[in-house]
Amino acid sequence: GTINFMHLNSFYICSSITECNCFMGKLYVVPTPVGNLEDMTFRAIRVLKEADLILAEDTRTSGILLKHFEIKNAMQSHHKFNEHKTVEGIVNRIKAGETVALISDAGTPGISDPGFLIVRECVKSGIEVQCLPGATAFVPALVASGLPDERFCFEGFLPQKKGRVTRLTSLQEEKRTMIFYESPYRLVKTLTQFAEFFGAERPVSVCREISKIHEESVRGTLTEVIAHFTQNEPRGEIVIVLGGKED
């Protein structure tokens, strides 16, 4: 495209930052809906439409979202298996003036999703990083749980094997509300383990399919909620909100 210059006191000020590479670009971290597409913000759509490059965890999954909102910008795969190899090239593109937007399959990148590495490298390089407010699964689950939400700790996915018992042991004295992500296939096993470590009467809320048609929160003691999901096979994305240790 053409570059417009404005003459001002013998200085030329470029009005097209990206095209002439006068300044460094920017990294936008853009949340995407965890369920209902209506949860996409106007600003998120605008940023994605204006980006020179969109980094997507899975280009096929994100392709559906982008097509829905008529976003046709260049997209590149960026996930935990390739981010160590691609991050340097992306940082260099931003340094050269490109605007890059990072999205994950659902929710806010970096929260139990790829994103930390590219953000850290951009910060190290002096690149401006802006994270848009938006969808993330654990906040609605926490607020709707009925458990104390003024202080909480987010644990994400527990280690599957090595370090799992150590992590659970370290949380036995935790007084804040705890938040975990889990797959439906491991839910009952994890809740049963919680009962062993935290006591069967500990209050819990299991929220699944957040912002989708079959959204559901099941609340009660660990014993009660284990019984429910033993009889009713859990499906969909799961957030476990567990009460902290009482004084």
Identify the function of each model-found stretch:
Residues 5-8:
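Short hydrophobic targeting helices and cationic amphipathic motifs
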